[in-house]
A protein has these predicted regions:
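Bacterial N-terminal signal peptides
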Residues: 29-45
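Extracellular/periplasmic ectodomains of large secreted or surface enzymes and adhesion receptors
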Residues: 49-53, 361-365, 431, 437, ...
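Histidine-rich, glycine-flanked metal-binding segment
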Residues: 50, 54, 63, 67-109, ...
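Acidic, glycine-enriched loop/beta-strand segments at the rims
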Residues: 50, 55, 63-75, 88, ...
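His/Asp/Glu-enriched, well-ordered alpha-helical/loop segment
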Residues: 122-123, 130-143, 151, 279, ...
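Polyanionic/metal-chelating signatures
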Residues: 161-311, 442, 448, 455-456
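Central antiparallel beta-sheet cores of small beta-barrel/beta-sandwich binding domains
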Residues: 467-543, 548-565
């Protein structure tokens, strides 16, 4: 596509212009143009095959390794996805692309310690008679088991189409501990890096943790029907796993004369995960839940981690004494927006809202290990704001940074490759123009597995948008090679800000900024051309059914039109009227 753009423009140049531009013979000029067009036409394909530089030197920056003291005026060398050196006088390889780090600060990539980012969306429940929700399928075992699917693996259910991958990455989160959702034993979590061309590229550690929930998949309207029933059910599942494991071991040792134990898929999956040293994540947000989690951890005799942890300020010393790590939910409690103003909250509820952000400081003071996770936060930038609240409540900034980097890596046993800036570790880095927890600081670059992503402030529209560009659009244009098409999947915010992806026969790219202002739009993608990031800018107008405009790259243009496949003009007109009414 992009090579065709240059061909179209270059081929239209007059002979005299070409002679003056190149200062050589017309034949030599055409050879140069042909070579340039060939290189640019291959650029998207090369990017997909690793055309991005493999060696980088970020020179003269402030480096915050987390595992050691801060380094001033230091250089970080990245080679083929791995940190090769971190030092003030690190030698720079000849093949490295040098990035000027003056005035910049390098941090380890951040880790969201418990989420479902990068997972396939859970199927929506279908309605039954009278609007009742259909119940999810049951796991078959000694009895029907609701929401017990431990054979599901996050490593097998990676969804590269999840747009949150880019959103989290742009906010500085290079790694997540992600799990399938739904039910009391939804599946096995995995450690994922947030970049890759294929699903398996994201997986850092496949069998990491077994999340447990005390909320049935169908709510308490279905079995087990109550909190006490859910607790009893979960305990029984672990008893079944223990019995099944022991019975299987006895049979394998001497199968003669012994009845063969029945294979049970759920038990086998849980036993296998435990053999792989997977942690068991137990819900524990308030004091009652935390002490209940103590009891469950004692009964199960497994390596347990508490998650929730927002009332840890009341029992921090007990948690530390038991050496139980805590994953702290950063969605701090707050008043419900639609709460009845006459329904005054209890004093305990008000105290909880006020003191929850102090839980990390209480745990740090007690000597407990903890990490942060997003919980119900949908905008990852809000996670740093939530961490800032915990800093304001007494947590040291260094401890806050550690809870976003090295601590989760240690909890999930990947600190040998993630969580700090050290030679030999995966090159997951974020580069900022200031202190990470300063609200004015901007993230400039992110590296995931050594791949560079430039982070830009989104363009803002000047006028309210006339219509909504959300949806898939077919872009049509003509190059000297013939007609070509690209599919652009757009999402538009209420203020007209655009995001999305472009897919073409020559490669794929993410939209790094864009907007619809009145009836005028613009969006930008960035691709590597000859090893350098290059902007490709789409601009034009929207008449309610069609987009028309031009694609510009390195000062050269080609015209395009875009329509929504399979959508009638009347439907688009109605949507536009609705957008105008907004």
């Amino acid at each position: 596509m992009f090579g065709g753009i240059l061909t179209s423009r270059c081929c239209s140049m007059k002979e005299s212009a070409m002679r003056s531009w190149f200062g050589r013979s017309r034949l030599f000029a055409w050879h140069l143009v042909a070579l340039l067009v060939f290189a640019l036409a291959l650029a998207p394909r090369l990017a997909a095959q690793g055309g991005e530089p493999q060696y980088f030197a970020i020179r003269g920056a402030t480096v915050v390794p987390v595992s050691g003291p801060r380094l001033e005026n230091a250089t970080v060398i990245v080679a083929r996805g791995v940190i090769k050196a971190v030092a003030k006088d690190a030698p720079i390889p000849d093949e490295a692309l040098v990035i000027d780090g003056k005035g910049l600060t390098i941090y380890p990539g951040l880790i969201d310690a418990f989420t479902d980012v990068g997972m396939m969306p859970a199927p929506a429940p279908s309605g039954g008679e009278g609007g009742a929700h259909a119940q999810p399928p049951l796991s078959r075992g000694p009895e029907d088991r609701p929401g017990t699917t431990p054979w599901r693996s996050a490593a097998d259910e990676v969804n590269l189409a999840d747009k949150r991958i880019e959103t989290w990455r742009s906010a500085g989160f290079t790694t997540v501990v992600s799990s399938p959702k739904g039910g009391m034993f939804p599946g096995v979590a995995a450690v994922l890096d947030l970049d890759g061309e294929r699903n398996g590229d994201l997986v850092v550690k496949p069998s990491t943790a077994i999340p447990v929930s005390l909320q049935p998949a169908g709510g308490f309207t279905s079995f087990p029907g109550s909190l006490m029933g859910a607790i009893a059910y979960v305990r029984q599942v672990w008893l079944d796993v223990d019995w099944s494991t022991k019975a299987g071991a006895i049979y394998q040792k001497n199968p003669r004369g012994v009845a063969r134990p029945r294979y049970d898929r759920a038990n086998a999956a849980l036993a296998e995960a435990l053999e792989d040293h997977a942690l068991v994540l137990i819900p524990a947000n308030n004091t009652t839940q935390i002490r209940r989690a103590f009891d469950l951890a004692d009964r199960w005799h497994v390596h347990s981690v508490l998650y929730g942890g927002q009332m840890s300020y009341e029992v921090a010393s007990e948690i530390a004494a038991r050496k139980l790590p805590v994953l702290i939910d950063l969605k701090w409690p707050e008043a419900e927006k639609d709460a009845d103003p006459d329904d005054a909250p209890s004093l305990r509820a008000l105290r909880f809202r006020d003191r929850a952000p102090s839980s990390p400081a209480a745990l740090a003071k007690a000597g407990a290990k903890f990490a942060f996770y997003s919980g119900a936060i949908t905008a990852p930038k809000d996670m740093l704001k939530a961490v800032k609240k915990s800093i304001d409540a007494g947590l040291a900034p260094d401890a806050a940074l550690r809870a976003l980097t090295l601590s989760p890596a240690e909890i999930f046993d990947v600190a040998d490759r993630l969580g700090s800036i050290e030679a030999g570790k995966i090159a997951n880095l974020i580069i900022t123009d200031g202190d990470l927890f300063d609200e004015k600081t901007k993230i400039k670059l992110v590296f995931v597995d050594g791949r560079r992503f430039e982070i830009r402030e989104p363009e803002k529209p000047k006028d309210p948008p006339k219509g909504d560009l959300t949806g898939k659009w077919k872009f049509s244009y003509t190059t000297p090679e013939g007609p070509e098409e690209s599919i652009v999947d757009l999402s538009m915010a209420s203020d007209g800000t655009l995001s999305g992806t472009l897919s073409s026969p020559r490669g794929n790219a993410n939209i790094i900024s864009g907007y619809l202002s009145a009836d005028k739009f613009s969006f930008t993608i960035n691709i590597p051309i000859e090893g350098s990031p290059t902007d490709v800018i789409f601009t034009g107008t929207f008449d309610g059914t069609t987009m028309k405009g031009s694609i510009s790259v390195q000062g050269l243009d080609i015209d395009f039109t875009a329509t929504k496949p399979g959508r009638s003009g009347a439907a688009d007109h109605v949507a536009t009227q609705q957008g105008d009414a907004r």
